[in-house]
Each structure stands twice: as structure tokens, then as C-alpha cells.
């Protein structure tokens, strides 16, 4: 029975798309990682809680098949903000979020990152230069 569960999860992982624009935050990649952790021994893995495992699979399968989208249809494909799905994908991409974080940095933080030494030995040398200067 564990082999059947493993194969069902593998099939679900194969069908679940991975969004490359969401590096480190994508549900498909996270799902693959969790399945690999849960079934370390592949088909030979002993499932401690078979009912919970089956329930999790069914929940993920419903999400993947858009069960709730069909059960609760929306009259329009818009949101409160009026943005389209493509615009949301662009806004929520990792690159755009990094750009927003860069824009929100203070001038002082930007200067620190630009001119501060990056390697520990360079930091040590910079501090010794500053501390060894004679005070006037």
C-alpha cells in the first residue's frame, strides 16, 4: 500500500508546475522537497499515519485539479485591485520583490553595501587602519 501512495504522490509532483519566477517560494518545488523527505526509501517507506497521508494527497489533488475554482466559480477574473493574473505574476516574482527591497533601502545602507569590505580579513584591516590613526 505504501508503494501505491508513493506512486500517487510522484504522479502529482510530475503534474504540479514549478514557477521559476518564484525561486525559493514556489509551492511545486516545496511539494517535491516534502515528498522526497517523507518517502526517503521510495516505495519501501513505511507510512506511520496512512489516513493522514491519504487525506493530504486528496487535499493536494483537489487543489491541483482546480476543484474549488469549479465549485465556486467567479463571474469575472479580476481582483479588488483590478490587476490581471499576468500582472500579479510579474509583481510577485522574486526579481520584482528584490527590486522593491533594493528601492526601499536607505541611502546609508546602499553606501555601506557599496563601499564596505566583503571579506572578513578586509574588514579586520579596515578597522586596524581606522583605530591606528593618530587623533588630532
From Swiss-Prot:
The record's principal subcellular location, in a coarse class, is mitochondrion
- This protein's source sits in the domain of life called Eukaryota
On whether Transit peptide is a keyword of this UniProt record, the answer is: yes
Q: Which GO terms describe its biological process?
A: mitochondrial respiratory chain complex III assembly; positive regulation of mitochondrial translation; regulation of insulin secretion; regulation of oxidative phosphorylation; regulation of skeletal muscle cell differentiation
Matching InterPro entries: UQCC2 (IPR037698)
What Gene Ontology cellular-component terms does the record carry? mitochondrial inner membrane; mitochondrial intermembrane space; mitochondrial matrix; mitochondrial nucleoid; mitochondrion
Transit peptide, from-to: 1-13
User: What Pfam families has UniProt attached to this entry?
Assistant: UQCC2_CBP6
Its localization reads: Mitochondrion matrix, Mitochondrion nucleoid; Mitochondrion; Mitochondrion intermembrane space; Mitochondrion matrix
Keywords in UniProt for this one? Answer: Membrane, Mitochondrion, Mitochondrion inner membrane, Mitochondrion nucleoid, Transit peptide
Q: How does it assemble?
A: Interacts with UQCC1.
Q: Tell me, what does this protein do in biology? A: Required for the assembly of the ubiquinol-cytochrome c reductase complex (mitochondrial respiratory chain complex III or cytochrome b-c1 complex). Plays a role in the modulation of respiratory chain activities such as oxygen consumption and ATP production and via its modulation of the respiratory chain activity can regulate skeletal muscle differentiation and insulin secretion by pancreatic beta-cells. Involved in cytochrome b translation and/or stability.
Its name, as the record gives it, is: Ubiquinol-cytochrome-c reductase complex assembly factor 2
The organism encoding this protein is Rattus norvegicus
**Name of encoding gene:** Uqcc2
Amino acid at each position: 500500500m505504501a508503494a501505491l501512495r508513493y506512486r500517487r504522490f510522484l504522479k502529482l509532483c510530475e503534474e504540479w508546475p514549478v514557477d521559476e519566477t518564484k525561486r525559493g517560494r514556489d509551492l511545486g518545488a516545496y511539494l517535491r522537497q516534502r515528498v522526497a523527505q517523507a518517502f526517503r526509501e521510495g516505495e519501501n517507506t513505511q507510512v506511520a499515519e496512512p489516513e493522514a497521508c491519504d487525506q493530504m494527497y486528496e487535499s493536494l489533488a483537489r487543489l491541483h485539479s482546480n476543484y474549488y475554482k469549479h465549485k465556486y466559480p467567479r463571474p469575472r477574473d479580476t481582483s479588488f485591485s483590478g490587476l490581471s493574473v499576468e500582472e500579479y505574476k510579474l509583481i510577485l516574482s522574486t526579481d520584482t520583490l528584490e527590486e522593491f527591497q533594493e528601492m526601499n533601502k536607505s541611502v546609508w545602507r546602499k553606501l555601506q553595501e557599496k563601499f564596505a569590505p566583503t571579506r572578513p580579513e578586509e574588514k579586520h584591516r579596515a578597522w586596524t587602519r581606522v583605530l591606528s590613526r593618530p587623533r588630532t
